[in-house]
A protein has these predicted regions:
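Hydrophobic alpha-helical transmembrane segments
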Residues: 169-216, 424-447
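Alpha-helical transmembrane segments of multi-pass membrane proteins
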Residues: 67-72, 109-113, 121-153, 343-350, ...
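Small-residue-rich midsections of specific transmembrane alpha-helices
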Residues: 63-89, 247, 251, 280-305
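N-terminal membrane topogenesis motif
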Residues: 1-43, 60-61, 230-239, 456-483
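Transmembrane helical elements of multi-pass membrane transporters/channels
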Residues: 199-299
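Short runs within selected transmembrane alpha-helices of multi-pass transporters and secretion channels
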Residues: 78-82, 139-160, 195-209, 350, ...
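Specific pore-lining/lateral-gate transmembrane helices of multi-pass inner-membrane transport
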Residues: 94-104, 277-357
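Alpha-helical transmembrane segments of multi-pass membrane transporters
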Residues: 153, 168-190, 350, 402-423
Length: 483
């Protein structure tokens, strides 16, 4: 994220209201804009193509397909991306740029294999048991694979510091998707639901191809050293578990409520809970600005303190190390408190706006009853995300693992318990899980503050560890003495 910080520093140098608004807008573009582009495209398609006139069963099939494509493409990419990101960071630090393409190829293979391993049996069930048209099933599978490739290639574009291009490629892909949908329905007279799914698949593939071309344009040399990449999965297995548990925790409460009386089943294949899922979506959007605020604040303030501490460790005096460490942790505490304060104000304003405005547009009943508790849960969850990033800064993978494990398990158990209660408390599982993860991560950061010196100076090795044949015990012979 260093590239974002450099760009933001240039923007904020002017110290004007317009500069601050520009910086906030830039942070939004590189973080949440792609998601809003996709959502906006689907909504625009629905309005222009007359989606509301489609039968209830067909709409349910489209909603279930699109929901599963997004959720499981994220879950598929989760185990690999954190480790691959760590590998690329080390490669760039060591200036071994020719090792980036092997990393890309290995990650691409692993993502496609895992996605296919999960997707093909599901699609076979959808066709054979759900009796869904084979062409529709195949198109949905292609859209799923395309989105996996999109999410995967985004990791490498961030290394190229082409954050704007990620949003631009999403915008291009979704513009083509909208044009294709209009062409298929208005000109060719094709069925609305399938035309929307096919158009989105085309848009995702176009986005993936543009990202792939950019990666290949930046990194042309290939060292063909693939074993190094695989070795990182053994060395940093905790990153695999952390990223997967955090991503699973985002959706595990939804999975629980998909098996309650809120359940909607389509074609004996897709199971989801529209009421709970919609409340979840509203709660996430209520707190989404915290991601933008966090990136802006960390890149502008904490990263500078962290860099100063790192430089002091490398070649500074003990007094310099101690002072920079104290300043760094004071800045960390300040950033967390600022994030909580700013996000609380924004979330409260958005919550009140939703409560007042949304009922006028049909959002009422159980959705608005479930929404408040989930909004609180996502508020704590995004603060937990910030703490996990700080733990990554200090290379405390054990702390991050404990936090995400507690978050995921308590969210699941709490959701199972709250599912039997009132609608108002359906989100208590997420609240309890997020608070558990937040508490573990908070105390782990405090532990790191107290034991930072041991963590930095006592965690390494004085001698290089090698695996080879043991040398002979004879170290001196009479012949050597005569020489």
């Amino acid at each position: 994220m260093a590239g974002i910080g450099i760009k933001l520093q240039k923007i904020y140098e002017k110290k004007t209201i317009l500069a601050y608004l520009t910086g906030f807008g830039y942070s939004a573009v590189v973080t949440v804009a792609p998601m809003f582009v996709v959502i906006g495209t689907v909504m625009l398609m629905s309005q222009l193509l007359g989606y509301e006139n489609v039968g209830y069963a067909r709409r349910g099939l489209f909603s279930g397909t699109l929901l599963y494509i997004f959720i499981f493409s994220l879950l598929t990419a989760a185990p690999f991306n954190a480790v691959l990101s760590r590998y690329m960071s080390d490669v760039i630090y060591e200036e071994r740029y020719e090792d980036i393409l092997p990393c890309y190829d290995v990650g691409l293979l692993l993502n496609i294999l895992l996605a296919s391993l999960l997707g093909i049996p599901f699609c076979a069930w959808e066709h054979l048991v759900g009796h869904v048209n084979l062409i529709f099933v195949f198109t949905g599978f292609c859209g799923y694979i395309a989105l996996v490739l999109v999410f995967y290639s985004m990791l490498y574009l961030s290394i190229c510091k082409d954050y704007q291009k990620i949003s631009l490629y999403f915008l291009t892909g979704m513009a083509v998707a909208l044009a294709c949908a209009l062409f298929f329905v208005k000109v060719c007279g094709r069925e609305i639901v399938y035309s929307m799914l096919l158009s989105l698949t085309i848009g995702f593939f176009l986005t993936a191809v543009l990202e792939y071309a950019t990666v290949k344009r930046y990194f042309k040399r290939n060292s063909n050293r693939y074993r190094r990449v695989f070795s990182y999965f053994g060395r940093y297995w905790k990153l695999v578990v952390i990223n997967f548990l955090y991503t699973l925790g985002l959706y595990i409460h939804n999975f629980v409520f998909w098996n309650t009386d809120l359940q909607m089943r389509v074609a004996d294949t897709f199971v989801f809970a529209p009421t709970y899922d919609l409340a979840t979506c509203l709660a996430m959007f209520t707190n989404l600005s915290s991601t933008i605020i966090f990136i802006t604040r960390v890149e502008m303030h904490f990263h500078t303190r962290y860099k100063a501490y790192s430089e002091a460790v490398i070649g500074g005096r003990w007094e310099d190390i101690k002072n920079t460490k104290d300043r760094m942790f004071r800045q960390l505490s300040a950033e967390l408190m600022n994030l909580v304060r700013m996000q609380f104000i924004i979330s409260t304003a958005v919550y009140l706006l939703c409560v007042v405005v949304l009922p006028q547009y049909g959002f009422s009943g159980r959705v608005m009853q479930i929404y408040p508790c989930l909004a609180v849960g996502y508020f704590i969850l995004f603060i937990l995300y910030a703490e996990i990033i700080f733990l990554y800064y200090f290379n405390d993978l054990t702390g991050a693992l404990l936090a995400t494990l507690g978050f995921c398990l308590v969210t699941w158990a709490g959701s199972v318990l709250s599912a039997g209660g009132s609608d108002l408390w359906y989100g208590m599982g997420l609240v309890a899980g997020s608070f558990t993860g937040f508490t573990i991560a908070y105390f782990r950061l405090r532990f790191m503050e107290r034991h930072m010196d041991e963590h930095i100076f006592c965690g390494g090795q004085l001698f290089t560890v090698k695996r080879e044949r043991m040398p002979e015990s004879m170290v001196y012979t009479k012949k050597q003495k005569e020489r």
